[in-house]
Amino acid sequence: MASKRSRLLFDILSHYDLYGTEIDIMKELKKEKVWLVQNKKTKERYVLKRLSEDKTNFPILLHSKLYQERFHVPKIFQTKTDQYYIHRKGHYYYLMDYIVPSGMKPSFQQRIEGLARFHAHSLFADWIAPRPSSFLEPKDVLSAHRQKAAQLEEQAKAIDHGDALSHIMKQMAWIANQSYAWLEKSNLADFCRTAKERKAICHGDYNSNNLLLAKNREIMMIDFDRAYYGLPLDDFRFLLVSLMKNPKNDAVKRTRLLFALYFSICSLYTPYKSVYAADAMFPHVFYSETVGREKQKQVLHSPSSLDLLTRLAEQETKKFAFLSDFFKSEG
């Protein structure tokens, strides 16, 4: 006898003209959230996804709009009544194409290109419901930046013992404050206003798992569960941190490529390079590492911690020097 869950899923699929005798629910790709479905006759595969009601239907409607605009996302199907989802028991269910993966991860260059294209293509004339009640103001951005800089300052003061770690912490706190000063000088207010006028959307979770390299070599973006109206700078920062997490990576090379590629594709934000550069100056990776270790009550002075923080600090210092010159050249 079929379980309640199976009966519910088959009922959902029937709204897409897919019936129990014709389909197999092959496996659960993500526990109680994502299922792989196959048509027995055609062998076509689909992904059925469940989205919690508290996330609203925004991610689904965004996906549908991107598909309509021919952006590289999996095809999303409509029900027999031309809806993009079924609402059941506090959840939204929607059906999309299954993308056959190549088995390879997208390169960091492809990830940059993917984000830039998303920011350039996710600008729609009308708001996607639910419309946001507010949009980030310059004071909000500066306040968050100032708070993080203050945390680094506090950490530096707390371990001021005149040793190598003390020197590193002071250096990172100084860079954080310089980043804040540059951000204050930038055209941040105009950037925030423009993003609101353009109804800018952030992916919200742009990690390497949410950009697929398909078997046919196409790059496909997936999973808009955390997407929201906001500053594209948030996604840019997230990607910058992701590209620099490994201290072995060349910080300057990757930062240079990020700025060059992103703005060559998403040129509409070119007037605000100074905002992006000022934010990117902040030692984001170093900050995440030290704050994370502090929360877990890990000792920063241990040999392994000191070695990692030293390498991250070197990386952050090189990135800061490059961006300082970049900021001045942009002017």
Positions of predicted regions on the chain:
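ATP-binding glycine-rich phosphate-binding loop
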Residues: 13-40
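Active-site acidic catalytic loop and adjacent metal/ATP-binding pocket
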Residues: 34-39, 183-234
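ATP-binding pocket architecture of kinase catalytic cores
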Residues: 42-130
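ATP-dependent phospho-/nucleotidyl transfer catalytic cores
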Residues: 53, 129-201, 257, 307-311
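A glycine-centered beta->alpha junction motif in the catalytic cores
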Residues: 91-105, 149-155, 239, 283-302
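Active-site activation/catalytic loop segments of kinase-like enzymes and analogous catalytic loops
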Residues: 233-268, 282-307
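Central hydrophobic cores of alpha-helical transmembrane segments
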Residues: 275-282
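Helical subdomain adjoining the active site within ATP-dependent kinase catalytic cores
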Residues: 293-331
